[in-house]
């Protein structure tokens, strides 16, 4: 299951998975998606390795660096929310 986390000013949606246990590693999948005239720009990153598993559309290298900074700054919260079934928002 994927849970909403944040929407950036340009319309990019950030969602994350449940906590995934793979052997002795706890993982979270984070997906970035932005609507375009042709469909979507999409990127997916796996934490804690910061491995990009999908990159489609027209996100720029600068945006990718921004996503990596965002992930680094938010990883602790993404893990917390993933373990608890998403952020609880009223």
Task: Give residue spans per PLM region.
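Intrinsically disordered, low-complexity segments enriched in polar/charged residues with Gly/Pro
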Residues: 5-6, 31-32, 65
């Amino acid at each position: 299951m994927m849970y909403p986390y944040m929407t950036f000013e340009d319309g990019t949606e950030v969602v994350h998975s449940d906590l995934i246990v793979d052997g002795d590693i706890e993982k979270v999948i984070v997906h970035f998606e932005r609507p375009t005239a042709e469909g979507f720009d999409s990127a997916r990153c796996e934490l804690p390795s910061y491995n990009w598993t999908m990159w489609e559309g027209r996100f720029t290298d600068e945006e990718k660096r921004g996503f990596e900074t965002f992930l680094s700054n938010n990883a602790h919260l993404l893990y917390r929310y993933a373990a608890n079934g998403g952020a609880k928002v009223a």
